[in-house]
Regions:
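Catalytic nucleophile loop of clan PA
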Residues: 113-124, 271-294
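Extracellular low-complexity, O-glycosylation-prone stalks/linkers
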Residues: 379-394
Length: 394
């Protein structure tokens, strides 16, 4: 806790860190922190070693209460997840997390998402981007000790649309192990992690569904944490999504046609794009299934028409390697069903819909007598076959 005792973390017990290995906490507000240890009844001496202290500044949001201290540090064009743009994505947002990472002596920020699997057993897999495990300066890969100290933030969001609206009470998980790594060079920049512990039921998270087909979606969103800011949503649909090959200024070339290129739309409350910290975040199709993970791009609030490249989930699936650590199919389809798509799953076991339901249009109401109103509408048009007709009722 901090010196003012206004920000408290814990208590941490053997249940929090059952293996007694490396562990980390989320950030504490303030310049002074106090670590309090309560020994067991026995005379056993404590074995505690503080390996490193990370000092966050400028871009890290740590407040001593549940209210934001001001606008976020991401670009001014960003749209908060609880604006109207996110109304139809309230389940999916509960699976998206901010990742605070330790790689050697350096800290990084990325985004990721819980993902469902065909066993529907709520195994806490996190889907993200491989480059999130690399030190940008020297390419060093996060070690097992590093991964045990990664912290995953869920529900890190404003409760309203404005940056001045209250902040939700976030939940964190600490530690993971690497399951699948697919690099940028010659690959699709995919990463599958498994959290060290099962997520408590009261966390109210969501295991997002996926679509491993090669079909380019006509519309969708990206939910992410740009610059480590509170959760944002970026929307696309006015510009066709295109297949492309990754090539960056470090001369790294991805596998041919292993990325989606997305240009985001201006919406009611802004023109969200992506930034550093958005890396690894999920790209959702119109049916609310993950089809990609962010590698990077050149879009900014000044260049909203810039490119945003996502490693294809279809490539992550089984196209990079036959090794268990280079493909996601054996982990996310453990029953070997051959499923192409799968819906999301809540912690209560409720599955998401594979249909993105739309509102009727041209709704009119006409009073035809003192006790009757004629309501008419046009039903929405779907790309999937469902029961839907135009009509009227009294």
């Amino acid at each position: 806790y901090n010196a003012e005792k206004t920000h408290l973390l814990g208590a941490y017990t053997s249940q929090t860190n059952p293996d007694g290995k490396s562990f980390a906490t989320e950030f504490v507000a303030g310049d002074d922190i106090i670590l309090e240890y309560e020994p067991p009844v026995s005379d056993e001496k404590a074995r505690i070693a503080i390996n490193q202290i990370g000092y966050g500044y400028n871009h890290l949001h740590v407040t001593t209460d549940l209210r934001s201290t001001g606008p976020g540090t991401s670009g001014s064009c960003m749209v908060n997840i609880n604006c109207e743009e996110g109304e139809e994505w309230q389940n999916e947002k509960n699976g998206v997390c901010m990742m605070v990472e330790k790689i050697g002596k350096v800290g990084y920020l990325c985004s990721g998402s819980l993902v469902n699997n065909t066993a529907k057993d709520m195994k806490p897999y996190i889907l993200s981007a491989f480059h999130c495990t690399q030190d940008y300066d020297n390419g060093k890969i996060a070690s097992e000790t590093d991964l045990n100290q990664w912290v995953f933030y869920f529900h890190f969001e404003h409760t309203g649309c404005e940056n001045t609206s209250p902040v939700a009470g976030h939940k964190t998980m600490t530690g993971c192990r690497r399951i699948v790594s697919i690099p940028i060079e010659g690959g699709s920049d995919g990463l599958l992690l498994l959290l060290n512990d099962k997520i408590p039921a009261e966390y109210n998270v969501y295991f997002n569904g996926w679509d491993r087909s090669e079909t380019a979606t006509s519309s969708g969103v990206n939910i992410h944490h740009p610059s480590g800011d509170y959760m944002k949503i970026s929307t696309f649909g006015n510009h066709p999504i295109k297949t492309t090959t990754w090539l960056d200024n470090l001369s790294r070339t991805g596998a041919p046609n292993a990325h989606w290129n997305v240009i985001f739309d201006k919406t009611t409350n802004g023109h969200s794009i992506t930034e550093g910290g958005s890396s690894g975040s999920p790209l959702f199709n119109e049916n609310k299934q993950i089809v990609g993970t962010l590698t990077g791009g050149n879009s900014t609030c000044r260049l909203t028409s810039g490119n945003n490249l996502y490693g294809k989930f279809s490539y992550h699936w089984d196209k990079y390697s036959q090794a268990d650590t280079g493909r996601m199919d054996i982990w996310l389809d453990p029953l070997n069903t051959g499923a192409t798509t799968i819906p999301g799953l809540s912690q209560t076991g409720e599955e998401g819909s594979l249909i993105n339901y739309k509102s009727p249009t041209n709704v009119t109401a006409q009073s035809i007598s003192s006790n009757n109103v004629l309501i008419q509408w046009n039903a929405p048009v779907y790309t999937q076959l469902i029961s839907s007709v135009s009509g009227s009722t009294q």
